[in-house]
Amino acid sequence: VSPKPFASARSTSAQGFTFFPPELASQAEFEGLSPNGDLQGADELLRERYFRRIHGYPANASTDRELVALILEKARRIVSHPTRPTFSEVLPYTQAPFEELALEESLDEDPTLDAVEALRVERQRERRVRCVAMLDTSSSMAGEKHLLASVAVAVLLLEMPPEDAGLCVFSTGARVVRRLGERKSAQATVLDFLRTTPKGFTDISLGLRKGHEEAVRSGSSARSVGILVSDGRSTEGDDPLPLARRFRTLVVLHLDGPGSDLAASQALAQAGGGTCLVVDDFADLPRRLYDAVRLVLRR
C-alpha cells in the first residue's frame, strides 16, 4: 500500500494555474542535457568527463578513476586544511610525562611544585563527531547538479575521518552509500554516488529515516549529527518533521530555487535542533557543505 503523500505531486497556485514539481520537468529534460552548457565553479575537463559518462560513452575502470580523481582534486581546492575538533584534558604528569605542564592545576595540587606526583599536564585530544549526510537524488538533481553534489560528497569525505562520515541518498527510495564506521575509500564512495542516477520524486521523510537508522545502527546516535541536502519540498511520503526531531543535531543545506520551500527547510532544522544554511547558487553547494561540516565539528 502506497504511503499517504505528505505533499501533492501537482499543486495549484493562488491564481489557479496548475504546475508540476521540478522532478517532472527534469526527468523529461535529462536525456537532452548538453555538455556545452554552463557549469560555474567546475573545471571544463571535469565537466566533459562527467557528461561523456552520462551520455552513454563507454565507461571502464580507467575512465572512472580519472573522473573520480578530478572530483577529488576539485574538492581538495575547497578543503585546503582539514580540521579536527579537539578538547583539553588534565592528567597526572606520571601518566603523560611528555605533555605540556598545566601550571595552574599543578599549583592547586602542590604550591611548592616539589612533589612529582602532584604535577599535572594538559593534553589535547580529538573530539569524535559522527556525521550522516542525506542527499536528495530525485530527478530535479540530475545533470550538473549531480556532478556538483559529487564534489560536495568528496568534500565531506576529505573533511571527516573515514569512519566518522556516513552517506545516504534518497528520492522515491533511499539507500546507504557509505556506512558509519566503514573504512570505505573516498574514491569508492564517490564512484558509488556517481552511479546513483537521479530519478523519482522527493521523499524527505524517507531520507531522514534512513539517515537516523544508520546512526542508530552504528551505536553512535547520541553523538551523531545529520546534514540534510534538499530544497525542502517533499513531493511524496510522510511529514518529515517527526523524523527531524530524532536527530541530536540536524543541519539543513537548503537548495534555493524555483519550487523550493525555505520555510520547510528552516522548520526541519529547528525540529532537529540545528540550523539552516541557504545555498543560493547550486555551484556553491560543495563550499556550503564544507561550511556545514565545520559547523558540525565545532558543536
Language-model segments: what does each one mean?
Residues 1-128, 185-186, 286-288, 292:
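Acidic/polar low-complexity segments with low predicted structural confidence
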Residues 183-187, 268-271, 294-297:
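Short, hinge-like loop/turn segments at secondary-structure boundaries
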Residues 232-272, 277-280, 290-291:
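VWA/integrin I-like adhesion module and closely mimicked acidic/polar interface patches used
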Residues 191-208, 280-298:
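Extended, charge-rich low-complexity interaction segments
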Residues 111-114, 129, 161-162, 246-249:
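Short glycine/proline-enriched coil/turn segments at helix->beta-strand junctions
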Residues 126-182, 186-229, 233-236, ...:
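Von Willebrand factor
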